[in-house]
Amino acid sequence: MKAAGILTLIGCLVTGAESKIYTRCKLAKIFSRAGLDNYWGFSLGNWICMAYYESGYNTTAQTVLDDGSIDYGIFQINSFAWCRRGKLKENNHCHVACSALITDDLTDAIICARKIVKETQGMNYWQGWKKHCEGRDLSEWKKGCEVS
Protein backbone atom coordinates (compact mmCIF):
# COMPACT_ATOMS: atom_id res chain seq x y z
CA MET A 1 0.00 0.00 0.00
CA LYS A 2 2.89 2.36 0.81
CA ALA A 3 4.38 1.64 -2.63
CA ALA A 4 1.11 2.61 -4.31
CA GLY A 5 1.16 5.91 -2.44
CA ILE A 6 4.71 6.60 -3.55
CA LEU A 7 3.83 5.72 -7.14
CA THR A 8 0.86 8.08 -6.94
CA LEU A 9 3.15 10.86 -5.78
CA ILE A 10 5.67 10.12 -8.51
CA GLY A 11 2.89 10.05 -11.09
CA CYS A 12 1.75 13.48 -10.00
CA LEU A 13 5.25 14.86 -10.33
CA VAL A 14 5.90 13.27 -13.71
CA THR A 15 2.76 14.60 -15.37
CA GLY A 16 3.99 18.16 -15.29
CA ALA A 17 0.38 19.25 -14.88
CA GLU A 18 -0.45 21.59 -12.06
CA SER A 19 -2.26 19.62 -9.42
CA LYS A 20 -5.56 20.83 -8.05
CA ILE A 21 -6.82 19.42 -4.81
CA TYR A 22 -10.47 20.28 -4.34
CA THR A 23 -12.13 20.87 -1.00
CA ARG A 24 -14.92 18.58 0.11
CA CYS A 25 -17.58 21.30 -0.24
CA LYS A 26 -16.37 22.47 -3.65
CA LEU A 27 -16.62 18.89 -4.90
CA ALA A 28 -20.05 18.53 -3.32
CA LYS A 29 -21.23 21.50 -5.38
CA ILE A 30 -19.62 20.23 -8.59
CA PHE A 31 -20.96 16.71 -8.10
CA SER A 32 -24.43 17.99 -7.22
CA ARG A 33 -24.57 20.21 -10.34
CA ALA A 34 -23.40 17.24 -12.42
CA GLY A 35 -26.36 15.18 -11.22
CA LEU A 36 -24.39 12.68 -9.16
CA ASP A 37 -26.61 12.97 -6.07
CA ASN A 38 -28.72 9.79 -6.11
CA TYR A 39 -27.35 8.72 -9.50
CA TRP A 40 -28.16 4.98 -9.64
CA GLY A 41 -29.28 5.33 -6.02
CA PHE A 42 -25.95 6.57 -4.68
CA SER A 43 -26.12 9.66 -2.49
CA LEU A 44 -23.82 12.63 -2.87
CA GLY A 45 -22.02 11.41 0.26
CA ASN A 46 -21.03 8.22 -1.56
CA TRP A 47 -19.38 10.20 -4.36
CA ILE A 48 -17.56 12.59 -2.03
CA CYS A 49 -16.38 9.76 0.23
CA MET A 50 -15.23 7.68 -2.74
CA ALA A 51 -13.28 10.57 -4.32
CA TYR A 52 -11.57 11.23 -0.99
CA TYR A 53 -10.42 7.66 -0.50
CA GLU A 54 -9.47 7.15 -4.14
CA SER A 55 -7.47 10.34 -4.74
CA GLY A 56 -7.65 12.67 -1.76
CA TYR A 57 -9.61 14.99 -4.13
CA ASN A 58 -6.46 15.37 -6.27
CA THR A 59 -7.27 15.89 -9.95
CA THR A 60 -3.85 14.72 -11.15
CA ALA A 61 -3.51 11.62 -8.97
CA GLN A 62 -2.06 8.65 -10.84
CA THR A 63 -1.37 5.18 -9.50
CA VAL A 64 0.66 2.62 -11.45
CA LEU A 65 -0.68 -0.89 -10.82
CA ASP A 66 1.17 -4.21 -10.89
CA ASP A 67 -0.31 -5.10 -14.30
CA GLY A 68 1.17 -1.92 -15.84
CA SER A 69 -2.14 -0.11 -16.11
CA ILE A 70 -2.62 3.27 -14.46
CA ASP A 71 -5.49 4.67 -12.40
CA TYR A 72 -6.14 8.31 -13.29
CA GLY A 73 -7.58 11.38 -11.65
CA ILE A 74 -10.00 12.18 -8.90
CA PHE A 75 -11.89 8.89 -9.37
CA GLN A 76 -8.79 6.77 -10.15
CA ILE A 77 -10.20 5.45 -13.42
CA ASN A 78 -8.15 2.61 -14.89
CA SER A 79 -6.42 2.85 -18.26
CA PHE A 80 -6.87 -0.80 -19.19
CA ALA A 81 -10.66 -0.78 -19.20
CA TRP A 82 -11.93 2.78 -19.26
CA CYS A 83 -9.60 5.27 -20.98
CA ARG A 84 -7.08 5.46 -23.81
CA ARG A 85 -3.40 5.80 -22.99
CA GLY A 86 -2.24 4.85 -26.47
CA LYS A 87 -1.84 1.11 -25.98
CA LEU A 88 -3.61 -1.23 -28.38
CA LYS A 89 -4.89 -3.64 -25.71
CA GLU A 90 -6.86 -1.02 -23.81
CA ASN A 91 -10.65 -1.21 -23.98
CA ASN A 92 -11.43 2.51 -23.53
CA HIS A 93 -15.10 2.02 -22.59
CA CYS A 94 -15.41 5.73 -21.76
CA HIS A 95 -14.08 6.76 -25.19
CA VAL A 96 -11.74 9.31 -23.62
CA ALA A 97 -8.01 9.89 -23.40
CA CYS A 98 -6.64 9.14 -19.94
CA SER A 99 -5.05 12.60 -19.94
CA ALA A 100 -8.57 14.10 -19.97
CA LEU A 101 -9.16 12.49 -16.57
CA ILE A 102 -6.35 14.40 -14.85
CA THR A 103 -7.41 17.98 -15.51
CA ASP A 104 -9.12 20.47 -13.23
CA ASP A 105 -12.19 20.27 -15.47
CA LEU A 106 -13.97 17.23 -14.06
CA THR A 107 -16.48 16.85 -16.90
CA ASP A 108 -14.86 13.84 -18.59
CA ALA A 109 -14.06 12.17 -15.26
CA ILE A 110 -17.67 12.55 -14.10
CA ILE A 111 -19.08 11.25 -17.38
CA CYS A 112 -16.78 8.24 -17.19
CA ALA A 113 -17.54 7.59 -13.50
CA ARG A 114 -21.26 7.63 -14.29
CA LYS A 115 -20.64 5.12 -17.08
CA ILE A 116 -18.67 2.88 -14.71
CA VAL A 117 -21.51 2.92 -12.15
CA LYS A 118 -24.08 2.18 -14.84
CA GLU A 119 -22.14 -0.57 -16.60
CA THR A 120 -20.86 -2.29 -13.47
CA GLN A 121 -24.16 -1.93 -11.59
CA GLY A 122 -22.83 0.19 -8.74
CA MET A 123 -19.77 1.59 -7.02
CA ASN A 124 -18.00 -1.69 -6.24
CA TYR A 125 -15.43 -0.80 -8.92
CA TRP A 126 -13.77 1.52 -6.39
CA GLN A 127 -11.90 -0.27 -3.59
CA GLY A 128 -11.72 2.93 -1.53
CA TRP A 129 -15.51 3.15 -1.61
CA LYS A 130 -15.96 -0.52 -0.70
CA LYS A 131 -13.56 -0.28 2.23
CA HIS A 132 -14.50 3.11 3.68
CA CYS A 133 -17.91 4.22 2.39
CA GLU A 134 -20.18 1.28 1.54
CA GLY A 135 -23.00 0.71 4.01
CA ARG A 136 -22.07 3.67 6.24
CA ASP A 137 -23.84 6.85 7.23
CA LEU A 138 -22.30 9.31 4.78
CA SER A 139 -24.32 12.39 5.70
CA GLU A 140 -21.21 13.98 7.26
CA TRP A 141 -19.53 14.17 3.85
CA LYS A 142 -21.78 17.01 2.70
CA LYS A 143 -22.42 18.55 6.12
CA GLY A 144 -21.72 22.28 6.14
CA CYS A 145 -21.66 22.45 2.34
CA GLU A 146 -24.21 24.58 0.53
CA VAL A 147 -25.87 21.76 -1.38
CA SER A 148 -29.37 20.39 -1.01
UniProtKB/Swiss-Prot annotation:
Which Pfam family, giving just one, matches this sequence?
A: Lys
According to the UniProt record, one GO cellular component term is: extracellular region
Can you state which reaction this protein catalyses?
Answer: Hydrolysis of (1->4)-beta-linkages between N-acetylmuramic acid and N-acetyl-D-glucosamine residues in a peptidoglycan and between N-acetyl-D-glucosamine residues in chitodextrins
- Keyword hit for Cell inner membrane: no
Q: What UniProt keywords are attached to this protein's entry?
A: Disulfide bond, Glycoprotein, Glycosidase, Hydrolase, Secreted, Signal
Question: Which pairs are disulfide-linked?
Answer: 25-145, 49-133, 83-98, 94-112
Coiled coil ranges: none
Q: Where found?
A: Secreted
- Residues of the signal sequence? 1-19
Q: What is its EC number?
A: 3.2.1.17
The segment(s) forming the C-type lysozyme domain are 20-148
Cite the active-site annotation. 54, 71
- Statement: the UniProt record of this protein carries the keyword Hydrolase: yes
Q: Which GO molecular function terms does the record list?
A: lysozyme activity
Where do the record's glycosylation annotations fall on this chain? Answer: 58
Family from the record: Belongs to the glycosyl hydrolase 22 family.
The record ties this protein, via PANTHER family, to:
LYSOZYME C (PTHR11407), LYSOZYME-LIKE PROTEIN 1-RELATED (PTHR11407:SF62)
Quaternary form? Monomer.
Q: What is this protein called?
A: Lysozyme-like protein 1
User: What is the organism field in this record?
Assistant: Homo sapiens (Human)
